[in-house]
């Protein structure tokens, strides 16, 4: 593996280069990784140890997970020093400094105009980047002015055509560098030319691998493992960060966790890696672990807002109202106009059953970021709770437009159409959700219920779905109970008995009671009595005697029947049974 000192030197140089080009998000990400590198003990000072307190407990606790393979071998990492673009060797010109000042003040067109006669690659990048952001700014203004229901509008970035033309010409002549290639890839992606966009972004990260923004854009274009594997990427430690993120988005969570475990060998105190690990654990539904990790993350970085929306989802799922209330109050005081903050507050109101207020905050999040996927999906859920299915469908469709591989939005569409009594449509959307997440029992159960509706009534298909749900570890036990009932309905009593016994074993192991247990005990007692397996039947009847009311009377009736079947005479005395 590349040395820590080598990584540290590369990142320090990259932060300066990224900041010089106003790529502030990439510079911030790089800075977070810089302080995430474990310091040499000989260099410990109060200044450089402050960022590395407290994280080690989580790192030790979760760096080795049973589901993770052994750390990846240290193969082929580039250890060359950061190449210094030629323009960085000289002092920036006066015009560039003024243009950068305009850019920092969000006067993008003014910055672009100031650089109109500059020919250096650095100046060309900032000129066209400023023009791109000027177009984005105007697009956002038009979206507010022209928006229709749920914020729909036809606003576009009107600079994309000229940007594509100019950047394409500059690329052909070799007049742009890796940063220009990154911008060219972004423009091509916006125009829907994904293949060329990937090629441009790959060229960019291969020539300058420290621009996290370029890696992020490339990851968003890797919608399948086949596309990811087809990329011709140079070996570099930044590639490992990219693959960890890409695997996570492709729902390859074990592989993603393995990458992050490997990277922790150098970036031992990286809050980013800890947050990404928590995301993967969340997808694996390890909510208790995720909660601990986010609590530790907030202790180390108390004013952090990014990724806290995921933490709020965990607290929502665990119905931890007090903790969610505290988190919502905290982010409100920190930065209430961040999309993540609005989403967290929306989750809080949703948990309290105040769905109108929740929708208001999800809408506010979308005002701040129209492409905020979670807000569209969560708003759809709220509309489902409010029985406003047309609005729910609209919200879910917006989520699908942003990310066609988001299983939650497809699942939401299925639920909405199911509520409207349109099982054929619901089935289509449930199938789409299962395509993107085939190992989730909840999706198979939803599709099975669709097959059970009166309009479809395809019980054999429902049985297949419930069997898949059982294989996907149905923690709620819905599938086993339904399999037993469906086989009973179809007159397959042997199969029904098998699944009732399995369900009973599950409930006993979990210490559960309730109607499902009573139903299973009655069926099994009756089934074994009818098959003259009286000892087994008595066992289930005896368990039924522990109930009170109608259940106990049912048990007595069954025991009388068993006694009569055994002796051939009516039983007049049940005192020998533990009633």
From Swiss-Prot:
Gene Ontology biological process terms from the UniProt entry: cell division; protein ubiquitination; regulation of defense response
Keywords linked to the UniProt accession: Cell cycle, Cell division, Mitosis, Nucleus, Repeat, TPR repeat, Ubl conjugation pathway
This protein's GO CC annotations: anaphase-promoting complex
Presence of keyword Cell cycle: yes
SUPFAM superfamilies per the UniProt record, alphabetical: TPR-like
Entry's localization field: Nucleus
Main localisation: nucleus
TPR repeat coordinates: 237-270, 272-304, 339-372, 374-406, 408-440, 442-476, 477-510, 518-551
Pathway(s) annotated for this protein in UniProt: Protein modification; protein ubiquitination
Functional description taken from the UniProt entry: Component of the anaphase promoting complex/cyclosome (APC/C), a cell cycle-regulated E3 ubiquitin-protein ligase complex that controls progression through mitosis and the G1 phase of the cell cycle. The APC/C complex controls several key steps in the cell cycle by mediating ubiquitination and subsequent degradation of target proteins such as cyclins. The APC/C complex is required for the female gametophyte development and is involved in several aspect of development by controlling cell division and cell elongation. Involved in the control of endoreduplication.
PANTHER family in the cross-refs: CELL DIVISION CYCLE 16,23,27, CELL DIVISION CYCLE PROTEIN 23 HOMOLOG
Subunit structure: The APC/C is composed of at least 10 subunits. Interacts with APC2.
Family classification: Belongs to the APC8/CDC23 family.
Protein name: Anaphase-promoting complex subunit 8
Provenance organism: Arabidopsis thaliana
């Amino acid at each position: 593996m590349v040395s820590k000192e080598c990584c540290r030197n590369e990142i320090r140089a990259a932060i300066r280069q990224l900041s010089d080009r106003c790529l502030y998000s990439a510079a911030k990400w790089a800075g977070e990784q810089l302080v995430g590198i474990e310091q040499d003990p000989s260099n410990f000072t109060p200044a450089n140890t402050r960022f590395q307190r407290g994280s080690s407990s989580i790192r030790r606790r979760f760096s080795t997970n049973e589901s993770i393979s052994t750390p990846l071998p240290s193969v082929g990492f580039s250890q060359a020093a950061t190449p210094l673009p030629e323009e960085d060797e000289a002092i920036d010109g006066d015009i560039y400094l003024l243009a950068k000042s305009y850019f920092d003040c969000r006067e993008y067109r003014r910055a672009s105009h100031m650089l109109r006669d500059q020919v250096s690659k650095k100046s060309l990048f900032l000129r066209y980047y400023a023009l791109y952001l000027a177009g984005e700014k105007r697009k956002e203004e038009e979206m507010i002015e022209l928006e229709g229901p749920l914020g729909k509008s036809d606003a576009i970035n009107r600079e994309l055509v000229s940007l594509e033309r100019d950047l394409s010409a500059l690329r052909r002549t070799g007049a742009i560098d890796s940063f220009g290639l990154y911008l060219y890839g972004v423009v091509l992606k916006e125009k829907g030319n994904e293949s060329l966009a990937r090629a441009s972004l790959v060229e960019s990260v291969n020539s300058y691998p420290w621009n996290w923004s370029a890696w992020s854009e490339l990851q968003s274009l890797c919608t399948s493992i086949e596309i990811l594997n087809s990329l011709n990427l140079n070996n570099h430690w930044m590639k490992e960060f990219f693959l960890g993120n890409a695997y996570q988005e492709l729902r390859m969570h074990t592989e993603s966790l393995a990458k992050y475990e490997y990277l922790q060998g150098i970036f031992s105190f990286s809050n980013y890696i800890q947050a990404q690990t928590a995301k993967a654990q969340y997808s694996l539904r390890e909510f208790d672990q995720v909660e601990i990790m986010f609590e530790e993350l907030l202790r180390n970085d108390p004013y952090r807002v990014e990724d806290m929306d995921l933490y709020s989802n965990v607290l929502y799922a665990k119905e931890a109202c007090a903790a969610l209330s505290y988190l919502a109050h905290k982010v409100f005081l920190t930065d209430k106009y961040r999309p993540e903050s609005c989403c967290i507050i929306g989750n809080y109101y949703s948990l309290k059953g105040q769905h109108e207020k929740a929708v208001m905050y999800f809408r506010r999040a979308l005002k701040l970021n129209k492409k905020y996927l979670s807000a569209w999906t969560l708003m759809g859920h709220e509309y489902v709770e409010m029985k406003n299915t047309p609005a729910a469908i609209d919200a879910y469709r917006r989520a699908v437009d942003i990310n066609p591989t988001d299983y939650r939005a497809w699942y939401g569409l299925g639920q909405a159409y199911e509520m409207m009594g349109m099982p054929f449509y619901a089935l289509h959307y449930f199938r789409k959700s299962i395509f993107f997440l085939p190992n989730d029992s909840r999706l198979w159960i939803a599709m099975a219920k669709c097959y059970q509706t009166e309009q479809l009534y395809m019980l054999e298909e429902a049985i297949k779905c419930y069997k898949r749900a059982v294989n996907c570890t149905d923690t709620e036990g819905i599938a086993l109970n339904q399999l037993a009932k469906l086989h009973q309905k179809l007159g397959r009593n042997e199969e029904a008995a098998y699944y009732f016994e399995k369900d009973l074993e599950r409930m006993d192991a979990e210490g559960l009671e309730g109607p499902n247990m009573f139903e299973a005990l009655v069926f099994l007692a009756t089934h074994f009595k009818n098959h003259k397996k009286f000892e087994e039947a008595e066992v289930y009847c005896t368990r039924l005697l522990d109930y009170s009311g109608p259940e106990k009377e049912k048990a007595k009736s069954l025991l009388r029947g068993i006694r009569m079947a055994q002796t051939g005479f009516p039983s007049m005395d049940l005192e020998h049974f533990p009633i």
